[in-house]
């Protein structure tokens, strides 16, 4: 069905909508004039999640209603809302035709609503998408983007905010580090143990993250990176977040206790307390919070090692934990540097803005620590010696970016002391993405080079032969 000369009737601006997730409807046009569209386009349903804005395509939603329903609440027309697919050439022609009717739209209101409803990535994309448009076109695009976001959120399933409470990407990383450690132990692997370890670790991680979000909505709302979190936007209340955390934490700890062993359950429960309690509290008090957070990241490898029946006194277990602990600093210090002004505004005490020189120096120090830790894994027979060679490539890559980050930060500090202007450290972003690639790569190499992994193909090593003969 083709659309031609589509008219937009006045939509009522709502200050609060069901579940608090439709706030972006504020950005819809407040004018009662009609907006003619001079081109015909294929009708698209507004709730299509597959349709994305791109640099070559702009989507404009129009609320279709008859002339007798101008005063009806906008939610009544959700079933009639459509998307028109417009090319850059078309939007220019259309905007010129509609300029007289759009002059009453508040660009400031549209921008505010769009930013409030969009995620950090979407905020950045929106700015790029409209950077080359005229003021009138920017108003139309930003209003359209905000409305599209709000209407998509009305289709959000009831459980989606609770999944978001667990910080899925962070939880996946935590689970993978525990599973990697489990796979690297010299003990026999049990699929049942691995299943309970995976589920229990994921639930404990989700519980800790939910507590963290439930405690910080007022501060998270001040940061672009966190303003889209479910508690901030009202999808769930803090009490609901705490209830969810209690349930997942209890079930997760029980799964670890009965499905794995009590040692792993204690480690899982301690991680909830450290992250949801101590770390979250220290974030607004002292820079030592980063070191506490690194301890939280080092516990999952110990959980994986203990889950297989391995002794926590084994040096190899602590080398694995050390890898995760050391990795936190180049990773997080680079991340926090890029958004240090927002951390400061929100009241989070981070090294990135309290002491930028220390921030870069600590990142470099722990990046270099990766080399001896990887040697330790081979020395204590967790991996073969080829791992030292392979892992050195990734370690050197991350250490290089950490060095450049530290070097440039020293230059910036000197320029600031001399009263001269300096630019953002460009190596922070490179170090951050380098660390994202580094950790999975090192863990994968460790599993490939696990001691005795290839004995079936190449035969046992001389050390293994001596052990066999001596026994």
Curated annotation (Swiss-Prot):
GO biological process: heme A biosynthetic process
Record flagged with keyword RNA-binding: no
InterPro entries associated with the record: Protohaem_IX_farnesylTrfase (IPR006369), Protohaem_IX_farnesylTrfase_mt (IPR016315), UbiA_prenyltransferase (IPR000537), UbiA_prenylTrfase_CS (IPR030470), UbiA_sf (IPR044878)
CDD domains tied to this protein: PT_UbiA_Cox10
Reactions the enzyme catalyzes: heme b + (2E,6E)-farnesyl diphosphate + H2O = Fe(II)-heme o + diphosphate
Predominant location category: mitochondrion
Enzyme class: transferase
Spans through the membrane: 188-208, 247-267, 287-307, 312-332, 368-388, 430-450
Transit peptide (first-last residue): 1-60
Signal peptide: none
Localization of this protein: Mitochondrion membrane
GO CC terms in record: mitochondrial membrane; mitochondrion
Membrane topology value: Multi-pass membrane protein
Top-rank taxon, per record: Eukaryota
Protein family (similarity comment): Belongs to the UbiA prenyltransferase family.
Free-text function comment from the UniProt entry: Converts protoheme IX and farnesyl diphosphate to heme O.
Protein name: Protoheme IX farnesyltransferase, mitochondrial
Originating species: Yarrowia lipolytica (strain CLIB 122 / E 150) (Yeast)
Gene: COX10
């Amino acid at each position: 069905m083709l659309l031609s000369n589509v008219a937009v009737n006045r939509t009522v601006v709502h200050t609060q909508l069901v579940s608090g997730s439709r706030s972006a409807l504020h950005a819809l046009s407040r004018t009662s004039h009609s907006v003619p569209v001079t081109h015909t386009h294929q009708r698209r349903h507004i709730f299509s999640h597959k349709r994305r804005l791109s640099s070559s395509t702009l989507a404009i939603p129009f609320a279709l209603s008859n002339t007798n329903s101008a005063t009806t609440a906008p939610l009544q027309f959700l079933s009639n809302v459509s998307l028109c697919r417009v090319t850059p050439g078309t939007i220019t022609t259309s905007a010129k035709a509609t300029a007289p009717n759009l002059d009453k739209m508040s660009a400031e209101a549209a921008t505010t609503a769009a930013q409030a409803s969009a995620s950090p990535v979407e905020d950045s994309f929106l700015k790029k998408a409209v950077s080359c448009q005229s003021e009138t076109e920017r108003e139309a695009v930003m209003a359209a983007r905000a409305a599209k976001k709000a209407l998509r959120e009305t289709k959000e399933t009831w459980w989606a905010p609770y999944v978001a409470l667990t910080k899925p990407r962070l939880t996946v990383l935590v689970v993978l580090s525990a599973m990697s450690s489990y796979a690297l132990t010299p003990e026999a692997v049990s699929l049942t143990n691995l299943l309970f370890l995976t589920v229990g670790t994921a639930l404990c991680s989700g519980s800790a993250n939910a507590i963290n979000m439930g405690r910080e909505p007022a501060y998270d709302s001040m940061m672009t990176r966190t303003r889209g979190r479910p508690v901030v936007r009202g999808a769930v209340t803090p009490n609901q977040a705490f209830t969810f955390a209690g349930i997942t934490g209890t079930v997760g700890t029980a799964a670890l206790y009965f499905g794995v062993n009590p040692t792993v359950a204690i480690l899982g429960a301690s991680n909830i307390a450290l992250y949801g309690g101590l770390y979250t509290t220290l974030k607004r008090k002292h820079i030592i919070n980063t070191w506490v957070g690194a301890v939280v990241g080092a516990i999952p490898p110990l959980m994986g090692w203990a889950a297989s029946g391995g002794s926590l006194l084994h040096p190899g277990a602590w080398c694995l934990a050390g890898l995760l602990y050391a990795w936190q600093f180049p990773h997080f210090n680079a991340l926090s540097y890029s958004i240090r002004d927002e951390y400061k505004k929100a009241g989070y005490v981070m090294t990135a803005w309290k002491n930028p020189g220390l921030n870069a120096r600590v990142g470099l120090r722990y990046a270099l620590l990766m080399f001896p830790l990887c040697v330790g894994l081979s020395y204590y027979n967790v991996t073969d010696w080829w791992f030292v060679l392979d892992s050195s490539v990734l370690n050197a890559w991350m250490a290089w970016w950490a060095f450049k980050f530290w070097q440039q930060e020293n230059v910036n500090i000197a320029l600031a002391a001399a009263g001269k202007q300096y630019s953002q450290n460009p190596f922070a972003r490179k170090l951050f993405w380098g660390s994202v690639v580094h950790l999975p790569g090192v863990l994968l190499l460790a599993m490939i080079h696990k001691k005795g992994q290839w004995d079936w193909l190449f035969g046992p090593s001389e050390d293994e032969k001596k052990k066999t003969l001596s026994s």
